[in-house]
């Protein structure tokens, strides 16, 4: 790619679509992805942050509107869809969570719908929003799938991890939680260091696997769309992009479901009294 950011080869096209719209937190200026090195700790992917917040607000507004206008008569299509989603999530929570918290069902609903909406951004034409961003708003880069950004998925997983610690301490107490980390699986004081390492790794692996699984699947899906658009002639792209998009609908739904299920299971395990 030239210094001006002109796209001249398939390699340039693919690289351009893998760049984030970034803000340098030290200068509060947009980062030029074509003239700077790799991202540092002080760069913020504001495209991922923007779309994740907008989609989260859209979820809240739509569900609030449906709840406010819900009727006991014949429901409309939107109300029916919302009721089906709520019923599905509620049944999942009843089957997998055995505690008494009233927060888990709303949390599971939020996680499922929010992740699903972010995943669905991958079904938009790959050049649509980046083209608008570049030619209308003058943005140097734009990626529109928040869950294809590891910082977003790990941030969500970090929130789940904090809830795991909270519910573990709430149900078992500080002493019980500490004992769980130091006296399992070997119930003898001499094995406390070994137990702490084993249980610590097990505890930390939960948010890591949760975030990286979602990121890996969505990044791979986005990359395949980019490769199809970047390597094939325009008249032949639909032969691969349409079947992949149909198959990808299953992937994005499944990944949202898996993220929700693992969140419920981890919190159920944390809420168990020993």
Curated annotation (Swiss-Prot):
Keywords associated with the record: ATP synthesis, Cell inner membrane, Cell membrane, CF(0), Hydrogen ion transport, Ion transport, Membrane, Transmembrane, Transmembrane helix, Transport
Example of a GO cellular component annotation carried by this entry: proton-transporting ATP synthase complex
Keyword Signal on entry: no
Translocase keyword on record: no
Compartment(s): Cell inner membrane
One GO molecular-function entry: proton-transporting ATP synthase activity, rotational mechanism
Disulfide bonds, paired cysteine numbers: none
Highest taxon of source: Bacteria
GO terms (BP aspect): proton motive force-driven plasma membrane ATP synthesis
Pfam families: ATP-synt_A
Mode of membrane association: Multi-pass membrane protein
Transmembrane annotation, as ranges: 43-63, 103-123, 149-169, 223-243, 245-265
Family affiliation: Belongs to the ATPase A chain family.
Function of the molecule: Key component of the proton channel; it plays a direct role in the translocation of protons across the membrane.
Binding partners and assembly: F-type ATPases have 2 components, CF(1) - the catalytic core - and CF(0) - the membrane proton channel. CF(1) has five subunits: alpha(3), beta(3), gamma(1), delta(1), epsilon(1). CF(0) has three main subunits: a(1), b(2) and c(9-12). The alpha and beta chains form an alternating ring which encloses part of the gamma chain. CF(1) is attached to CF(0) by a central stalk formed by the gamma and epsilon chains, while a peripheral stalk is formed by the delta and b chains.
Protein name as it appears in the record: ATP synthase subunit a
